[in-house]
């Protein structure tokens, strides 16, 4: 993974969240810049990202065949990387901080989006655009608990996303804490993360209208 250091220095990329608002993002925009997709992004018809990131063992274990069908560069948590052919393992049990060298350690930050931000920084991107980062979920029970979803998934862009699968309920407060680490790290290096997600539930990053980037 060291060979990826700064290969996209000075460039713009898009990190794609999997919220319902992603359905309103034109595919043409997703093909405009280098892209990071996560978890079940492959359910989005007509699209495959340049880089794929997954750090959740539940997702990887249940969806390994679909992930293996992707032809992009894949960064996978090291404990599950043996299931994904040709993937680059990342040590995703790092201390709670923004990690600048994800081939050594990476902090998950309770959201795979934060993992993607650390990798994007390592690859040298100076502008990161966010779409589909709705940061809103409907669920019962406590955050960060394992549950089985026996109905359509209304928290993601596809009703099939976690339908009939196990998932971990989100911890939005801790995710925001991680986002603040990313915001501070990018700003300190004259880089920027811009949230283009309409009605996003997180206010950590600068907000802009997606239309201005089309």
Residue map of PLM features:
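Metal-ion/cofactor- or nucleotide/acyl-coenzyme-handling active-site neighborhoods
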Residues: 1-214
